[in-house]
Regions:
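Membrane metalloprotein/metal-transporter helix-bundle signature
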Residues: 2-197
Length: 197
């Protein structure tokens, strides 16, 4: 028992003490930090996966244009954040984007392509701004931006994969899974929204 206790204490001493939060100080890699930023927050993960599911459900050209719009406009939002441009209520806007995207998935909103691209583009501004404004001071803006854009595209692909897997289920089951997943995401978005005030 004492040997196990010693091993546990030594292991605890080797654990890094830095918190894994959105904002970092000290030496950071621009690309790695940017890549991890969307993956480290449930708000970003939910929204970006929902964009992929929404794009899959729309089908056709929306399958690639909706995620591409999100990533492109998010880069603009990131630039605004890095430049210090203030956008009011960014965290509340991000929470609302989850609520809205969840509802769009749950209710199978069949928006015209331009409307769908406009909606996800609007949401992307806020997500990008959050990424950009939380970039570490010593990170390369270009590398950081490439990192968070790549991670976002990966999350969109996961969402498309989830959409494909759910769509492969038999008729009533697949629709029910979409409704439940979208509804739960909307509830999560609403809960995050309440925390902002």
């Amino acid at each position: 028992m004492t040997r196990l206790l010693r091993l546990a204490l030594i292991s605890l001493c080797l654990v890094p003490t830095a918190a894994s939060a959105h904002v970092g100080i000290g030496g950071t890699g621009g690309f790695a930090h940017g890549f991890m930023h969307p993956l480290s927050g449930l708000d970003h993960q939910l929204a970006m996966i929902l964009v992929g599911i929404f794009a899959y459900r729309l089908g056709g050209r929306a399958l690639w244009l909706v995620p591409l719009t999100f990533v492109s406009v998010m880069a603009l939002g990131g630039f605004l954040g890095v430049m210090g441009v203030t956008i009011p209520f960014v965290e509340a806007d991000i929470a609302f984007s989850i609520l809205a995207l969840g509802a769009m998935v749950a209710f199978n909103v069949r928006a015209p392509l331009a409307v769908a691209m406009g909606a996800v583009g609007l949401f992307a501004i806020f997500h990008g701004h959050a990424h950009g404004s939380e970039m570490p001071m010593d990170a390369s803006g270009f590398e950081y931006g490439i990192g968070f854009m790549l991670a976002t595209a990966l999350l969109h692909c996961i969402g498309i994969g989830v959409g494909m897997a759910t769509g492969a289920l038999s008729r009533p089951w697949g629709d029910n899974v979409y409704r439940c997943a979208g509804g739960l995401a909307s509830i999560a978005g609403f809960a995050l929204l309440l925390r902002c005030f």
